[in-house]
């Protein structure tokens, strides 16, 4: 059993229940946007159900890998490929947003004054909060790498400290991003600039929140002795995801904040 290449799992109700929760969320979202009665309630029920199913599903995955020994070396290879493909799919999302941004900025139409940024848009100074957030996020990338080296060296204390620093920096980044949104002189409704800016940076912020939860769970698991030198796939996946968030932010800073606001 130790070397078999098959990802054997117990029968689980969570995939079916997740699809039902996603259906409720989608239906409720459409009803809410069209002001139908009960749309908001249905959306809330669907979202809460989806979050609960995600929690219990990942709980079962942790049990299978940590306590039941289902995650053999060949299975871990498959899980790594799956995580890499997932990260690639996320990068394709951002590729679409950058495409929309450059399509609009490299050849601005007459409707926005044939200039970029569009006339009437007061852009953000890239050397204030955006640059500070860049430093914070790059520092968090360094601290998560520190945690990886600590786990590989068997230094659990350093791993816990470095992961706690990563979570703290991620929360600070999110707080500054929220402050930037509150003080921004334009909204998502302000034409193509506002829509592309908030879509790209907001989607990245959503990924930061997901990554923060991911790393916080890894911190909790490290405290519970779930990770060892040779078996810490959950942490590796979180670290890869966080580095993807770092790299995407660098492109956002250079392309949208610096070049796009010049």
Swiss-Prot record:
GO terms for biological process: mitochondrial electron transport, cytochrome c to oxygen. It catalyses: 4 Fe(II)-[cytochrome c] + O2 + 8 H(+)(in) = 4 Fe(III)-[cytochrome c] + 2 H2O + 4 H(+)(out). Component of the cytochrome c oxidase (complex IV, CIV), a multisubunit enzyme composed of a catalytic core of 3 subunits and several supernumerary subunits. The complex exists as a monomer or a dimer and forms supercomplexes (SCs) in the inner mitochondrial membrane with ubiquinol-cytochrome c oxidoreductase (cytochrome b-c1 complex, complex III, CIII). Belongs to the cytochrome c oxidase subunit 3 family. SUPFAM superfamilies: Cytochrome c oxidase subunit III-like. One of its GO terms (molecular function) is cytochrome-c oxidase activity. Its main location: mitochondrion. It is an enzyme of class 7 (translocase). It is found in: Mitochondrion inner membrane. It is a multi-pass membrane protein. It comes from the Eukaryota. Its EC number is 7.1.1.9. The lineage of its organism: Eukaryota, Viridiplantae, Chlorophyta, core chlorophytes, Trebouxiophyceae. The keyword Cell inner membrane does not apply. Component of the cytochrome c oxidase, the last enzyme in the mitochondrial electron transport chain which drives oxidative phosphorylation. The respiratory chain contains 3 multisubunit complexes succinate dehydrogenase (complex II, CII), ubiquinol-cytochrome c oxidoreductase (cytochrome b-c1 complex, complex III, CIII) and cytochrome c oxidase (complex IV, CIV), that cooperate to transfer electrons derived from NADH and succinate to molecular oxygen, creating an electrochemical gradient over the inner membrane that drives transmembrane transport and the ATP synthase. This is Cytochrome c oxidase subunit 3. The chain crosses the membrane at residues 13-33, 38-58, 82-102, 134-154, 159-179, 200-220, 237-257. Pfam families: COX3. GO terms for cellular component: mitochondrial inner membrane. Keywords: Membrane, Mitochondrion, Mitochondrion inner membrane, Translocase, Transmembrane, Transmembrane helix.
């Amino acid at each position: 059993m130790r070397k078999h290449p098959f990802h054997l799992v117990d029968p689980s109700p969570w995939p079916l229940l997740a699809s039902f929760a996603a259906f409720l969320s989608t239906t409720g979202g459409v009803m809410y946007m069209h002001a139908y009665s009960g749309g908001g309630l249905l959306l809330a029920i669907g979202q809460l159900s989806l979050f609960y199913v995600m929690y219990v599903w990942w709980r079962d995955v942790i049990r299978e890998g940590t306590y039941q020994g289902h995650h053999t070396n060949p299975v871990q290879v498959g899980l790594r490929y799956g995580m890499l493909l997932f990260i690639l799919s996320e990068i394709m999302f951002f590729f679409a947003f950058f495409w929309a941004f450059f399509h609009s900025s490299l050849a601005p139409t007459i409707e926005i004054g044939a200039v970029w940024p569009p006339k009437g848009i007061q852009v953000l100074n890239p050397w204030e909060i955006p640059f500070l957030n860049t430093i914070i996020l790059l520092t968090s990338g360094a601290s998560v790498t520190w945690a990886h080296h600590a786990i590989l060296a068997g230094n659990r204390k350093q791993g816990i400290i470095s992961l706690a620093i990563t979570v703290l920096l991620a929360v600070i980044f999110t707080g500054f991003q929220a402050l930037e949104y509150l003080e921004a002189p334009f909204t998502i409704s302000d034409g193509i600039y506002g829509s592309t800016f908030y879509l790209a940076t907001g989607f990245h912020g959503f990924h930061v929140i997901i990554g923060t939860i991911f790393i916080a769970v890894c911190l909790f698991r490290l405290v519970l002795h779930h990770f060892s030198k040779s078996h810490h796939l959950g942490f590796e996946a979180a670290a890869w995801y966080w580095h993807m968030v770092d790299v995407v932010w660098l492109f956002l800073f250079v392309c949208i904040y610096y070049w796009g606001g010049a």
